[in-house]
Structure formats: structure tokens, C-alpha cells
Amino acid sequence: MQLTPREVEKLMIYTLSDVAFKRKARGLKLNYPEAVSIITETAMEGARDGKSVEDVMKEASKVLTKDDVMDGVADLIPNVQVEAIFTDGSRLVTVHDPIK
């Protein structure tokens, strides 16, 4: 299978977010890469589902709380940017203050 660098990056995001969701379900606090992967995956899937950019940003900013992450992680993530594929093409989605 020949994958482009972008496809490899997407697979890495989805793989890490899968692990992160499982750890979150077990009650573990998430580290920086795990938190970013969940926020990113939520935005990418929302776009794929046909939601608007605004709805994707809102949903991705509510997927995690400070209680879900290790101390200090929320402060390390002022925003998350991801190029997501919507029904009408690719758009850059910026999720501001994604962990509240």
C-alpha cells in the first residue's frame, strides 16, 4: 500500500486518538499528544460528517475538560489547527482554547 505523507499523518492521528479515547475511558489523565489527537480527530470527523466549520470548532472545543488531562496540559494547548475535509473541500479549522 502506497500512502502519501498526509495519509500517514492522518493514520497516526487516528491511531493515537483511539489509544487516547481508551485511556480516557479507563479514567487516566491524558498527556499533550493524546489530548491534541482527540481534539484533532473530533474536528476531522465532524467535517467528514458534513457539519459546518463553526459546529466543528464548537464540538472540538468541548470534547475535553481540564479534568481529563494531566496538570499543565491545558495551558500548553492555546489552540489546535487542522486541515479538515468538508463536503465542499478542505478548510483550515482552528479550535481556540480547546480544553476548558
UniProtKB/Swiss-Prot annotation:
Gene Ontology MF terms in the entry: nickel cation binding; urease activity
Protein's cellular compartments: Cytoplasm
Keyword Magnesium on entry: no
Gene Ontology CC: one annotated term: cytoplasm
Catalytic activity: urea + 2 H2O + H(+) = hydrogencarbonate + 2 NH4(+)
Stored InterPro entries: Urease_gamma (IPR012010), Urease_gamma/gamma-beta_su (IPR002026), Urease_gamma_sf (IPR036463), Urease_subunit (IPR050069)
CDD domains: Urease_gamma
Pathway(s) it belongs to: Nitrogen metabolism; urea degradation; CO(2) and NH(3) from urea (urease route): step 1/1
EC number(s) recorded for this UniProt protein: 3.5.1.5
Pfam families: Urease_gamma
Origin superkingdom: Bacteria
GO BP terms: urea catabolic process
Keywords: Cytoplasm, Hydrolase, Virulence
Family: Belongs to the urease gamma subunit family.
General function of this protein: Expression of the urease operon increases the likelihood of bacterial survival by contributing to acid resistance in vitro and in vivo in BALB/c mice. Y.enterocolitica enters the body via an oral path and must survive the acidic stomach before being able to colonize the intestinal mucosa.
Subunit field text: Heterotrimer of UreA (gamma), UreB (beta) and UreC (alpha) subunits. Three heterotrimers associate to form the active enzyme.
Name assigned to this protein: Urease subunit gamma
Organism: Yersinia enterocolitica
